[in-house]
């Protein structure tokens, strides 16, 4: 007895989505589950049938093989890869009926056949942005090599002025059935590849493929706050599908260029602010850059090199909304260089006036005491 068509078993169309297949399976599984139908052999067999159908149709690779070759494509020894056109292993329906099937339909498949409709490939584009562009948002123009729908035939693959016709091999059903003795085998039509239509006069521009290779320019809106690693999906902007299939998607991968002043960590910005040792000692107010203009940074007297000061709200606003991050300014005290004689003498007088008082340089004196104890303990 021939196996029932898997789509028919689940009560769904051949173009049903994964969600529709799952919904149909759950409904039928609840209805025919053996626990709900004890001692009901018919319900048990029905449950096994829908389980087998779901196992195949819920797996993308198996579903593709089934759509191409029917039950033989997913039986024992069948090649599981989508687009695989052979069978491996021991005897199966493909081995039994393969030659007979090809004798009947093989010649017709080579004349006026139609390519199977395939979804276009997804594309990826790496987009380099400046930090300013990433923080403020921008519109970027990109140019990508891709397949686009053939304008001459509008993606149908048929010669302009003509249209695909009903497949004479399967009568537009997309499936053909072979009977050999007690066995019946249903196969995807080898001439129209399951579409039910064929292109009798292919388009000369795209050679019946329904798409051509060219460059495409797009304007991509970049939202404020994007960061390296963020990905923007442009639905339907990937490669055009083959033979009228749906297009793929374009994924724009964001990469932020290095900045001469700022570094970024999440929503926070970091920068180094060099100050003179006099300004660090006396304290004061400094002008520091932000991505929105100048800002005032107050540093207290006695500021040490490496201290970090926070300017709230001067960082990056999150891409999904919310309060802006902070700008963290690391003070780097700069030692003066290229001193003239007068300047050197002034510094020497300044050093003498300090009189090595602990209160002026507590860390230095603490370090000296630590070194002294170290040498005493080591008995150098």
Curated annotation (Swiss-Prot):
GO terms for molecular function: ATP binding; heat shock protein binding; unfolded protein binding; zinc ion binding. Keywords: Chaperone, Cytoplasm, DNA replication, Metal-binding, Repeat, Stress response, Zinc, Zinc-finger. Its cofactor is Zn(2+). Transmembrane segments: none annotated. SMART domains: DnaJ (SM00271). One of its GO terms (biological process) is response to heat. A zinc finger (CR-type) spans 137-215. Its main location: cytoplasm. Zn(2+) 2 binds at residues 167, 170, 189, 192. SUPFAM superfamilies: Chaperone J-domain (SSF46565), DnaJ/Hsp40 cysteine-rich domain (SSF57938), HSP40/DnaJ peptide-binding domain (SSF49493). Binds 2 Zn(2+) ions per monomer. Gene3D superfamilies: DnaJ domain (1.10.287.110), Heat shock protein DnaJ, cysteine-rich domain (2.10.230.10), Urease metallochaperone UreE, N-terminal domain (2.60.260.20). Residues 5-70 form the J domain. This is Chaperone protein DnaJ. It comes from Nitrosococcus oceani (strain ATCC 19707 / BCRC 17464 / JCM 30415 / NCIMB 11848 / C-107). The gene is dnaJ.
């Amino acid at each position: 007895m021939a196996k029932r068509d898997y789509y028919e078993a689940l009560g769904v169309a051949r173009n049903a989505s994964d969600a529709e297949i799952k919904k149909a399976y759950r409904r039928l599984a609840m209805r025919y589950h053996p626990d709900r139908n004890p001692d009901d052999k018919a319900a048990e067999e029905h449950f096994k049938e829908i389980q087998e159908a779901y196992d195949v149709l819920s797996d993308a690779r198996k579903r593709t093989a089934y759509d191409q070759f029917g039950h033989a494509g997913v039986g024992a020894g069948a090649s599981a890869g989508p687009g695989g056109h052979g069978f491996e292993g021991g005897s199966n329906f493909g081995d039994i009926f393969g030659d007979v099937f090809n004798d009947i339909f093989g010649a017709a498949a080579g004349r006026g056949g139609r390519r199977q409709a395939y979804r276009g490939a997804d594309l990826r584009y790496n987009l380099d942005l400046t930090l300013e562009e990433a923080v403020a948002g921008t519109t970027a123009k990109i140019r990508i090599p891709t397949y686009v729908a053939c304008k001459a035939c509008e993606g149908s693959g048929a010669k302009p002025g003509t249209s695909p016709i009903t497949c004479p091999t399967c009568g537009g059903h997309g499936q053909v059935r072979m009977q050999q003795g007690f066995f019946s085998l249903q196969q995807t039509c080898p001439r129209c590849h399951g579409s039910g239509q064929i292109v009798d006069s292919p388009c000369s521009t795209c050679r019946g493929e329904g798409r051509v290779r060219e460059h495409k320019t797009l304007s991509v809106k970049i939202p404020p706050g994007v960061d390296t690693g963020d990905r923007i999906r442009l639905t339907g902007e990937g490669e055009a599908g083959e033979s009228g299939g749906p297009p793929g998607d374009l994924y724009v991968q964001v990469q932020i260029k290095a900045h001469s002043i700022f570094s970024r960590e999440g929503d926070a910005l970091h920068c180094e602010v060099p100050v003179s040792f006099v300004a660090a000692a006396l304290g004061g107010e400094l002008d520091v850059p932000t991505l929105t203009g100048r800002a005032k940074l107050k540093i207290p007297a006695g500021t040490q090199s490496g201290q970090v000061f926070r300017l709230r709200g001067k960082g990056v606003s999150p891409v999904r909304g919310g309060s802006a991050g902070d700008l963290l300014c690391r003070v780097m005290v700069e030692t003066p260089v290229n001193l003239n004689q007068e300047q050197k003498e002034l510094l020497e007088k300044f050093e003498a006036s300090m009189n090595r008082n602990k209160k002026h340089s507590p860390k230095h004196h603490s370090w000296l005491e630590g070194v002294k104890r170290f040498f005493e303990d080591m008995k150098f």
